[in-house]
Design a protein with these regions (language model features):
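Aromatic "clamp/platform" in nucleotide-sugar-dependent glycosyltransferases that forms part
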Residues: 265, 284
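Nucleotide-sugar donor phosphate/pyrophosphate-binding loop at the beta->alpha transition
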Residues: 18, 71-78, 114-116, 124-151, ...
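Donor nucleotide-sugar binding/catalytic pocket of nucleotide-sugar-dependent glycosyltransferases
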Residues: 59, 142-192
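A conserved mid-protein helix/loop that constitutes part of the nucleotide-sugar donor-binding site
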Residues: 16-21, 204, 209-223, 293
């Protein structure tokens, strides 16, 4: 039976790079797919056209992705409610914290619609740290997740640690349906195996957040290059509005000191992976790190951390 499926995203980049295979599958099965993206990204015509060519319908909504302004978050909630009332989908899929929480809260007004939240990682509030701000955000997120997940038909996790933590914090109850999917998957046609290059190039690809282990990577680069100056440490990704972001001054210091080669925000992940010999992700916590899966598909040795999400990618 054909369904109308609404997918709520916090950014267009992840919708195209992480969900396009799922969207294509749903459309190939005969379902109608509407994608909801933040208003500020709605003008990215090239990216939107890629999904429109597959048959995706686009809508926009108000979202402050990393902000803590309650008025803006209330606008996100009302905006999602409005789109759902207009689209009248049969199924709503939301991923990342704010879309999951506010879509979940909206679902109490639409009891006949099935809601499937995807927990792709827990972010700043749930990583280790003793700061007052982090603790307050964590407590707020616990309360909001409890409210947002009440209306879910089934909750989809990407690793068992996140699921256990949600049980421990009583965010979800044992009788609530849930599944673990171990990541978003990688299209092996887009990330084929390639021979290792001869140059000793290490690559880290991530948003430039402290919680991603960017500082640890830079410090490791400094230590190694002091003894082996021909080794290259590349860093790719953007500065972010997240509370855990590093400063541009810190990034420029690493670049000027010569131990980090900064690639900026790259358009071709596959090309950068093909050029490196080792892939590194020293993250504090992930859902299931897509970049690690892509690196493995390409045939790159991976150095990552024994932390939730990351540990699932490695058989030790």
């Amino acid at each position: 039976m054909t369904k109308h499926i609404l997918i709520i995203s916090s950014e267009l980049f992840s919708l195209i790079n992480f969900r396009s295979s799922l969207i294509k599958y749903l459309i190939d099965c005969g379902h109608r797919v509407t994608a909801l993206v933040p208003k500020e990204e709605y003008n990215n015509e090239d990216s939107i056209q890629k999904l429109k060519s597959m048959g995706v319908i686009f809508k926009s909504y108000s979202l402050s992705r990393a902000g803590l302004n309650p008025f803006k978050d209330y606008l996100s909630y009302k905006s999602i409610c409005f789109v759902i009332s207009q689209c009248k989908p049969d199924i709503v899929i939301a991923y990342t914290a704010k879309p999951v929480i506010y879509a979940g809260m909206a679902m109490k007004h639409f009891p006949k619609i099935s809601f499937f939240p995807l927990i792709t990682g827990l972010g700043y509030g749930f990583t280790e740290g003793d700061g007052v701000k982090r603790k307050l955000i964590r407590q707020l997120m616990i309360i909001l997740y409890r409210k947002g997940l009440k209306s879910s038909e089934s909750i989809i996790f990407q690793n068992p640690d996140d699921k256990k933590l949600f049980y421990k914090l009583k965010i979800i109850l044992r009788n609530m349906s849930s599944h673990i999917v171990h990541g978003s998957g990688v299209d092996l046609d887009l990330y084929p195996f390639s021979p290792l290059p001869k140059k000793p190039i290490f690559l880290m690809l991530a948003r430039l957040l402290i919680d991603k282990g960017v500082r640890e990577y830079a410090e490791a680069a400094r230590i190694v290059k002091a003894q082996f100056p021909k080794v290259i440490f590349q860093l790719a990704g953007r500065l972010d509005s997240n509370p855990s972001t590093i400063s541009s001054n810190e990034l420029n210091f690493w670049i000027n000191e010569g131990f980090i080669q900064y690639l900026g925000e790259i358009s071709s992940v596959q090309k950068s992976l093909t050029s490196c010999r080792f892939y590194v992700l020293p993250s504090y916590r992930e859902g299931t790190p897509r970049s690690v899966l892509e690196a493995m598909a390409t045939g790159r040795p991976v150095i990552t951390t024994d932390t939730p999400g990351c540990r699932e990618t490695v058989i030790d």
